From Swiss-Prot:
It comes from the Eukaryota. This is Putative F-box protein At5g42430. Residues 4-53 form the F-box domain. InterPro entries: F-box-assoc_dom_typ3 (IPR013187), F-box-assoc_interact_dom (IPR017451), F-box-like_dom_sf (IPR036047), F-box_dom (IPR001810). It comes from Arabidopsis thaliana (Mouse-ear cress). SMART domains: FBOX.
Length: 395
């Protein structure tokens, strides 16, 4: 029975309801069943239905690299796990991506890979299907680059912000690439008034990029804010204690920017102290400070300075994970309101249970609109193959 015959016996709305509960990778395959199915699965109604259901079951996305190949897994985030102190979850394999690139960041369901050096192109990848699109190269003649993959929720546009660094890691030139236009071209923009070194810690919140930076003169830490829509920079002061610990992470907590870091007990194990600063007033730059103690009550899990802060979930749980894949591999969920720590053993990584570095992202949601954007980039964009070097461009 072909797709057209099947649709006569089963209402289309019911078909869409059933399909909306499948993984995005399966939806991609079903586009090929027939023209009718391809048309149904492209409807805005179905895309929104799929996103609604996917948003109700956010997942923790993992990325591992081994021998030049990236593999993506995800596991369900605990839903109302109170009363438990530990349990086991199984990671689902999504896809592999054979490119020898450095992972850069994750935005709105897409993973952005940065080649880091001027001889290679950057890549945007769909972690559910492995489909990807390459970005046009910026013809720079020197140095290393630092990139940020950003999203403007008002203009519904993805942008890439690229900073060129000179020998002392000082930011020299800044360019931006707007995706979603017919012709994709790099533009040079005004630099931040603070001459600074860019760290690897950042977050994009409601169309604003925040990243930790260090003043080139006194090496004091700041938070630089970049408005994705207006493409303007400003700097925020912050208590220097935020930068003194082993692990520092920017988070989005109750609609506000936050900074968290860890302080280990003697010997590197539990209990851990988690310090959090929250920006209560942006204009006045007023921060509040909280300190929490994380305890592993069962004393089953052993950690020795090998945890990193993945982020904070939409339900307000700080997520910690081990820096290397090992067996057993644990993820920890600390609930700030209840002051409880949940230990989750993640199984199912297979051959990757051998000390690969871990990249993890909270609240991963599959979005068909975003995934279609990658395919649109590959098929219809006209890339500017002769992007202008800094010496030729004007502000």
């Amino acid at each position: 029975m072909n797709g057209e015959e099947n649709s006569d016996s089963i209402p289309i709305d019911l078909i869409l309801e059933i399909l909306s509960r499948l993984p995005a990778k399966s939806i991609t395959r079903f586009h090929c069943v027939s023209k009718l199915w391809g048309s149904m699965l492209c409807r805005p109604y179905f895309n929104e239905l799929f996103l609604t259901i996917s948003s109700a079951r956010p997942r923790l996305l993992f990325a591992f690299s081994k021998h030049g190949e990236w593999r993506f897994f995800s596991s369900p985030q605990p839903q109302n796990p109170y009363g438990k102190s530990s349990f086991v979850a199984t990671a689902d394999f999504h896809t592999k991506f054979s490119q020898n690139l450095n992972i850069c960041n994750y935005t709105s369901g897409l993973v952005y890979f940065s080649a880091m050096w001027i001889t290679k192109a950057d890549v945007i990848c769909n972690p559910s299907t492995g489909h990807y699109a390459m970005l046009p190269k910026l013809l720079l003649t020197y140095g290393e680059t630092r990139s940020f993959f950003l999203f403007d929720p008002v203009g519904k546009q993805f942008k890439v912000l690229l900073m060129n660094k000179i020998n002392n890691n000082e930011t020299k030139d800044i360019h931006i690439l707007t995706l979603g236009t017919r012709k994709v071209r790099w533009r040079k923009i005004q630099q931040c008034p603070l001459i600074h070194i860019v760290s690897h810690e950042w977050i994009c919140i409601n169309g604003a990029l925040y990243y930790i930076a260090y003043n080139i003169d006194d090496f004091l830490g700041y938070i630089v804010c970049f408005d994705v829509r207006s493409e303007k920079f400003k700097c925020l002061n912050l208590n220097q204690d935020c930068f003194s610990e082993r692990s520092t992470k920017l988070i989005y907590y109750k609609g506000k920017l936050g900074v968290v870091n860890l302080k280990y007990a003697h010997g590197g194990g539990f209990p851990l102290k988690l310090c959090m600063w929250v920006l209560e007033d942006v204009e006045k730059q007023e921060w509040t400070t909280s300190v929490y103690t994380l305890r592993d009550e069962d004393r089953v899990v052993k950690v020795y300075y090998d945890l990193f802060i993945v982020g904070i979930t939409a339900t307000g749980e700080i997520v910690l994970a081990k820096k290397k894949v090992c067996k057993p591999f644990y993820v920890f969920y600390f609930n700030l309101e209840r002051n409880t720590l949940l230990s989750v053993e993640i199984q199912g990584f297979g051959e990757y249970q051998s000390c690969c570095s871990v990249h993890a992202f909270v609240d991963h949601v599959e979005d068909l609109n975003v995934y279609a954007f990658v395919e649109h980039m590959k098929k219809t964009y006209e890339y500017d193959a002769t992007s202008i070097s800094p010496s030729e461009q004007k502000l």
